[in-house]
């Protein structure tokens, strides 16, 4: 490393400077790629492997990283340390080779903890809302001129990246509870947005285990640190006496320290008042729809207020907030005449939400902002275990749309579970008597099956965490028009 690169490492433990080459297995994931991006910008030699290129790997290649689109033992040659995604199995040939060569193998969160060690860490945890809240906190701190480092699980649209190396002392990071690895983090401030049953295989199916893990995470705060917690969530309210740290609560609840009042949504914007203890009320215009995003903003404001950031800076950042990739992501509005011969248009929105609570929040935001629209959802269930465990919740939530098209379950490496498939879920929803779902067994036929159900005054929600985001972008690319054999088909 040259002198300029070493100067960037002022927030790194001195011994970490002995590390030269960091290899990431599963580098194409947003969380992994974000950490790799920060380390690349700090001057480390970065390599990594994944199965296929994507925007994350392209960005890292642009920064000088070496990316392999395979998993081979020789990929870890000369690495000082190997960082692994929780999605990677222990028998991966690169992990096996690293162990044989006595190269340290660590999880993503351990490397994130190293980045946070000598910085003022702000960690955002919770079942839902982490990515957007992380982006909001980052936006406010950037607007205040504090030049934070951030590592997010989704694309921060204003920056065009998942992660950025700043020169300030703040590190703002999404904290992942899916594999309990957030216990490696020792932040100064921790936000917990909500706690619901998800990733229960990590917690042996025991919700009490999940709750205790969140408490353990908060106990990583120093006694002078602060927990910022959504008191609207009944589980969080139950856990407050066990936190044992300074707490700021937020929510719509009357007893919240930072309280959301008078919420109104007009199109894609939320308008509301934030009441804070011993502070002037803030009248907020938030450039993100839905009551759930008002809560995310309240969490960000609670942290920023505690830091002493001026109100006018906070308001500017929230009004100009550009959102995150695949979170109520507006992809365009398209005329329907070329699609199905009808007059009028259809709006196309892409959203990552894949838990019933998240899907419900997206539907409510769509209904509140565009109440007159025909609401069409293209949904892809994510994981057979989640579909099984939350089956009735999915069936209840998905009946709220006007038209539902459902893709097959995205397995994410899981084996099928009888009765936890899309055909069964469609049958159950049909039995409720409200809507008649359409099963889309062939993703190449999405546009063909979508066109006939569009009326000319539609809002299409493309919803899910699997590969459905690619389908959303494809629909935008073809402007919803079904492709003939001459046009070519989406694979």
Curated annotation (Swiss-Prot):
It comes from the Bacteria. It comes from Escherichia fergusonii (strain ATCC 35469 / DSM 13698 / CCUG 18766 / IAM 14443 / JCM 21226 / LMG 7866 / NBRC 102419 / NCTC 12128 / CDC 0568-73). This is UDP-N-acetylmuramate--L-alanine ligase. Cell wall formation. Pathway: Cell wall biogenesis; peptidoglycan biosynthesis. It is found in: Cytoplasm. One of its GO terms (cellular component) is cytoplasm. Its EC number is 6.3.2.8. Belongs to the MurCDEF family.
């Amino acid at each position: 490393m040259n002198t300029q690169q070493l100067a960037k490492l002022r927030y790194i433990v001195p011994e970490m400077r002995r590390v030269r080459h960091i290899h990431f297995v599963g580098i194409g994931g947003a969380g992994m790629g974000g950490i790799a991006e920060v380390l690349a910008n700090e001057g480390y030699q970065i390599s990594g492997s994944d199965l296929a290129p994507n925007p994350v790997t392209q960005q890292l290649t642009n920064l000088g990283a070496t990316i392999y689109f395979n998993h081979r033992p020789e990929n870890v040659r000369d690495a000082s340390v190997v960082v692994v995604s929780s999605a990677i199995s222990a028998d991966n040939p690169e992990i096996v080779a690293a162990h044989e060569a006595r190269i340290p193998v660590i999880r993503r969160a351990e490397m994130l903890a190293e980045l946070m060690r000598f910085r003022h860490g702000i960690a955002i945890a919770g079942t839902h809302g982490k990515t957007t809240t992380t982006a909001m906190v980052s936006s406010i701190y950037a607007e205040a001129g504090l030049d934070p480092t951030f590592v997010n699980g989704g694309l921060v649209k204003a920056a065009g990246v998942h992660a950025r190396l700043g020169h300030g002392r703040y590190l703002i990071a999404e904290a992942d509870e899916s594999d309990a690895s957030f216990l490696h983090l020792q932040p100064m401030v921790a936000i917990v947005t909500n706690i619901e049953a998800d990733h229960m295989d990590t917690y042996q199916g025991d919700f009490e285990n999940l709750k205790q893990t969140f408490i353990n995470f908060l106990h990583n705060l120093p006694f002078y640190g602060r927990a910022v917690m959504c008191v609207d969530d009944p589980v969080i309210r139950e856990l407050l006496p066990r936190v044992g740290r300074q707490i700021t609560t937020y929510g719509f609840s009357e007893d919240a320290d930072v309280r959301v009042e008078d919420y109104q949504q007009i199109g894609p914007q939320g308008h509301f008042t934030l009441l804070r203890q011993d502070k002037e009320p803030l009248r907020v215009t938030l450039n993100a729809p839905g009551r759930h995003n008002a809560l995310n903003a309240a969490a960000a404001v609670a942290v920023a207020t505690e830091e002493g950031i001026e109100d006018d800076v906070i308001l500017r950042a929230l009004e100009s907030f550009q959102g995150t990739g695949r979170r109520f992501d507006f992809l365009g509005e398209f005329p329907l005449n070329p699609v199905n011969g009808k007059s009028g248009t259809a709006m196309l929105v892409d959203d990552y939400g894949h838990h019933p609570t998240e899907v419900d929040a997206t539907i409510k935001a769509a209904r509140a902002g565009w109440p007159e629209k025909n609401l069409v959802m293209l949904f892809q269930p994510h994981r057979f275990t989640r579909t099984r465990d939350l089956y009735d919740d999915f069936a209840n939530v998905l009946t709220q749309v006007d038209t539902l098209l459902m893709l097959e379950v995205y397995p994410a490496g899981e084996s099928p579970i009888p009765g936890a498939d899309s055909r069964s879920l469609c049958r159950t929803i049909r039995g409720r008597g409200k809507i008649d779902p359409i099963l889309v067994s062939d993703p190449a036929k999405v546009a063909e099956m979508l066109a006939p159900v569009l009326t000319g005054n539609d809002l299409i929600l493309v919803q899910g965490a699997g590969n459905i985001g690619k389908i959303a972008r494809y629909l935008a690319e073809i402007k919803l028009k079904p492709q003939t054999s001459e046009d070519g088909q989406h694979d």
